[in-house]
Amino acid sequence: MFVTTAVAGITINLAISSLGFAALVRPIPAMNQTVATLERMLSATQKPAALNYSRLGIGGVRLGMSVEEAKRKLGKPQRDETKPAAPAIGGKIRTLSYSGLTVAAWEGKVYLISTTNPKFLTIDGVKVRDNSQKVVKTYGYGSQSVQGGVTRLTYSNDQKASNLILEIKGSRVQKIIVGPPLN
């Protein structure tokens, strides 16, 4: 028996006999470009490049910056609150809230920045509402996860202590987060 089928741009020829079976897998000629593109994307997502720690920032605020320096860059926040950190961590967490931007600091140093406001750009010029092609052109292919229609591209920094995370819905950036790894 000989069967031929096409799945996702690939032709599969399958020969079945009493001795066993043999399969020949080959791309459909018209789909060669798509297959090559998918292979490049797959290999790139398996090994995302590490970002230099100095590239982790939004709106002129960088990780490790003092709260006072962040306030000088951003101006007076709409809300400024300080709460005790979890007992296992200790210390205090201070959160500065602006229109579509949140800056969190532990013991006076910025450790988390997130935005949904296109006014605030990453250090490399990516902003909310940019298309995913700009993200990939700027940062390459990050580690990907999908949940509820939102694709999360994660780029670790070279010290593996913090990440740049871009949440994409459709083909547009919806949220940008710079901070510790998220679960």
Please name every model-derived segment.
Residues 55, 120-121:
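A generic structural signal for short
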Residues 15-38:
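Signal peptide processing junction and immediate N-terminal pro/mature segment
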Residues 41, 46-47, 51, 55-57, ...:
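A cross-family detector of function-defining hotspots
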Residues 5-15:
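Bacterial N-terminal signal peptides
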Residues 111, 117-120, 132:
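A low-complexity, Ser/Thr/Gly/Pro-enriched, surface-exposed linker/loop concept
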Residues 124:
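Glycine-rich loop/hinge motif
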Residues 1-3:
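Bacterial Sec-dependent N-terminal signal peptides
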